[in-house]
Amino acid sequence: MTFGLVLLTFNEIEGIKELWDQIPFDEFDECFAVDGGSVDGTLEFFQQMNFSVNGQSKKGRGEAFRIAFNKSKSDFLIFYSPDGNEDPKDIKLIKNHFSNDDSLDIVICSRMMKSAHNEEDEQIFKFRKWANNIFNLFANLFFNKNFYKGYITDSINGFRGFKRSSFNILKLDAEGFTIEYQSTIRAFKNNMKIKEIPTIEGQRIGGESYAKSIPTGLRFINCLFKEILF
């Protein structure tokens, strides 16, 4: 049983510098980054740290996932974005769940379950969280065969790990931020075993999110209808 850690980056120099020493690289058989074309010093930082980087000729988070599995030889891959939203302490927890139960197909860090925290929780109007919960409800209603006993609370969050053999079965073709939503839906369709763990979502370190609310929401709607129809 081998494990790989993948850092997904696109202009994350502030985040990667602040979080680097908290990432448990020593826990993994291989570690590398997939970078979407950073121009802010992220690539130079990786070079300074002698850290392997795979570039993308085709942009998109979905493409980054596929590149990672093509480049990796590990049985399990964990994806981490060093932007401040994702808690590096949870990386080892994801790995431990796979180590303790190799029947798991996907492990997801949930921002919505009990003991978890979403970055909008202190706000009065939680538009992003509410939208996520709606998309999540639809995914469970339409596709989750174990809806009542195995309701998945955060089908969208990108902080997750996959078993290689399971990822290959999913045959994911989403290009951008819908890759995780599509992977959860297709895992439901294939009756895969998904484990969620509560996570504390932090505030972004530097810059702005590349997942703009309205365009991203429209892509999620498109993804949902495609999975319903096909």
Regions found by a protein language model. Give the residues of each.
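Short beta-strand/loop segment that forms part of the nucleotide-sugar
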Residues: 20, 28-37
